[in-house]
Each structure stands twice: as C-alpha cells, then as structure tokens.
C-alpha cells in the first residue's frame, strides 16, 4: 500500500442541496452541505440545467474553506442508468449519456457530470461513482411478476446497504462476502435487501411502489384500486406517480414525513399517529421476513440502518418481531459520504477494481 496521502472529493447531490466532503485518506477534512433556495432552483427547467450553478457553488465552497483544488479522485453518487452489478465505476461517455437521457430522471443523475467536469481540470484525477441505486444482482426468478409485460426492478439504497454490510463484517472479523445478511435501510424511502455472500439477490424497489410504505412512499398498493384511481379522472399521470413516491406513506396518512414529529404526536397521545407508524414498522418487519426466505432461512444477522434507525421506537419494535430470525444490529444514519470516500480510497490503494460502464 502506498504511503502517499490520497486526496478525495465526494459529491452527493440532493433535490435542494449538495453534500460535499473532502477526505485525506480516511480522515475527513471537510463535510459541508450547500443549500439552494426554492427561488434559486425555480429558474431551472430540470436538474441538468442546474449543473453550472451547482459546480460553481461547489468550487466557491472549497475556496471559502481553504481547500486547494487538488484531488486524486472525485467520486459522486451514482445515477439511475440501466441495471449494473455492484462496484466502483469510472465515469465515461456512455454513463454521461444514459444519465442525461435515461427514462428515470432524478437529481442523482447529475453527480457523475459534476465529477467528470471537475476531474478534467486535474491531471490524472479519477472521476468515479460507486454502488448506485440501480445495482442489480437479483435472482432471475426475483425479477418476474404476474404479468409478462411487467417486471420487478432493482432500485434500492445500494451504497449504504453495502457500506453497512462491510462495516458489520469488519466488526465481526469476517468478510462481507462470507456472510448472509438482511439489511433494512430506513429513510424517506425504505429498502430491505437479502445479501448472500456479497451480492444482494433480492430487494424491494424503494422508488416505484414495492415493499413497505415509508415516510414519503406508498409501497405496494392494491393493484385493482390503483388502476381504478388512475382511470378516475381525478389525477394526471404525474400526480399519480407523485402519490406513489413523494406524497405517499406517512405524508399521505399524517401530513408529514418527519418521524420526529410523528413520535412527538404519539407521545402526546395521538392514536392515529401510533397506528400508522406501527403499520409502517409492521410492513418493514414482514419484508425482513420475506428476505430471510430468499436466503432459505440462513441469515447470519439483520442490520437496521438509515436515518430512522436512530429512533428506538422503531428499532425496538422491529427487534421484537424479527429477532427470532437472526441477531439484530443497529447502524444508524446513511453515511453515504464516508461510503463513497471509502470506495474511492480502495481504488486508489489498488484494493478494489474499477469497473467499466457499458
């Protein structure tokens, strides 16, 4: 392993912010969130029109913090391309094309564009992404559903689930590739994956209406009722999609996606808030059980992660329901910046291969 200090810039674009981090090897020297006002974003017709502004604000932030623009690797949150295996990918023309013109448009698609534009300004600087949400290693039978013109897609919190798996494996003194794990990422969306020897062989689609409902997403809905709603004339296609992802789950039931507010309402005696949150927890527990079946019951551990794993109300009730399957371990938070930096550093040290996107 080289003793040279490796400098890494990490970029994680969100809908109203860009999270930025600078690492010197494993040590974070800057973690910053660049916020954008609604008025500032309203002038742009789409997320790609925001690219120059986001790039310039990032450079201004680095300068203001006294961080030299000198990096060995720039790694960004990956976009919604076609399905690919897990790993670290070099940003190339094919990735830039597919993120700009792909069917699924999301602000995460611009991350690789920012990374590529900045890396071009530096000699021998790598532009990378790692474990994007569309990582697909599902079993062939897991893709099928009851209509041949439709199929189950793999859209999940791959980056944090895999980083949490590696973290747990390191604590246990084993390799991620030697474990069978069920991992539940619980944030604005919820995905639960069955990880068999380093590959996620089954996971719910946390974006498009599959699995438990979450703070912002509806999860699996009764199909016939959904069809009737689509043809009722009350909502447009975009409005229906928003009711599935963005305005579903706790937002639809309780008017908020903030679980802290929901817990405060429960503490104050709000029976409806308790029922709805308990129903969400119940759905997550059922999905954990289903993923244990995908692993034929051979589960070494169940890992709870994401922002909601900070809430003892949620984790304690999940533990009650699923601890008969395997020991439950809690790793709160998303840690996406750290996970991206760890992937970049592993590449720079020659410990992880760089995959080619095609």
Question: Which functions belong to the PLM regions below?
Answer:
Residues 62-108, 126, 134-145:
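Short beta-strand-loop/turn "lid" adjacent to the catalytic site in phosphate-handling enzymes
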Residues 7-11, 71-75, 181-185:
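Short glycine-aspartate micro-motif
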Residues 312, 316-342:
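Conserved phosphate-binding/catalytic loops in two-lobed NTP-binding clefts
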Residues 242-296:
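Adenine-nucleotide phosphate-binding core of ATP-dependent small-molecule kinases
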Residues 299-318:
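Glycine-rich phosphate-binding loops at beta-strand->alpha-helix junctions
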Residues 8-49:
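Short glycine-rich, Thr/Ser-proximal phosphate-binding strand/loop in the N-terminal lobe
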Residues 58-73, 171-174, 288-300:
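Phosphate/pyrophosphate-binding loops at sites that engage ATP/ADP/AMP, CoA/4′-phosphopantetheine
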Residues 110-117, 144, 149-181, 189, ...:
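Glycine-rich phosphate-binding loop plus the immediately following alpha-helix
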């Amino acid at each position: 392993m080289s003793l040279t200090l490796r400098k890494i810039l990490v970029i994680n674009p969100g809908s109203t912010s860009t999270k930025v981090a600078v690492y010197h090897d494993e040590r974070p020297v800057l973690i910053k969130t660049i916020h954008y006002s609604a008025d500032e974003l309203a002038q742009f017709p789409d997320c790609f029109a925001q690219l120059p502004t986001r790039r310039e604000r990032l450079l201004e932030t680095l300068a203001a913090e006294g961080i030299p623009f000198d990096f060995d690797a720039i790694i960004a949150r990956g976009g919604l391309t076609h399905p690919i295996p897990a790993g670290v990918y070099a940003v190339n023309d094919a990735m830039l094309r597919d993120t700009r013109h792909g069917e699924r448009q999301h602000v995460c698609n611009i991350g690789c564009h920012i990374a590529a534009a900045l890396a071009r300004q530096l000699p021998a600087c790598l532009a990378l992404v790692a474990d994007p949400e569309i990582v697909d290693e599902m079993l062939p039978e897991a893709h099928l559903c009851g209509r041949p013109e439709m199929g189950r897609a793999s859209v999940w919190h791959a980056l944090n689930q895999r980083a949490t798996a590696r973290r747990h494996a390191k604590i246990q003194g084993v390799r991620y590739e030697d474990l069978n794990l069920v991992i539940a990422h619980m944030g604005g969306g919820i995905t639960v994956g069955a990880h068999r020897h380093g590959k996620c062989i089954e996971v719910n689609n946390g974006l498009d209406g599959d699995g438990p409902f979450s703070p912002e997403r509806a999860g699996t809905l009764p199909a016939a009722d959904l069809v009737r709603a689509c043809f009722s004339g009350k909502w447009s296609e975009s409005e229906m999609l928003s009711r599935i992802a963005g305005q579903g789950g706790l937002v639809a039931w309780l008017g908020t996606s903030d679980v802290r507010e929901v817990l405060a309402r429960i503490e104050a005696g709000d029976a409806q808030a308790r029922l709805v949150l308990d129903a969400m927890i119940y759905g997550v527990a059922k999905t954990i059980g289903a993923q244990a079946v995908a692993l034929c019951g051979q589960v070494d551990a169940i890992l709870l992660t994401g922002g909601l794993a900070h809430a003892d109300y949620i984790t304690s009730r999940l533990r009650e329901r699923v601890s008969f399957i395997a020991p439950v371990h809690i790793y709160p938070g998303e840690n996406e910046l750290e996970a991206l930096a760890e992937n970049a550093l592993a590449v720079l040290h020659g410990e992880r291969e760089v995959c080619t996107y095609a």
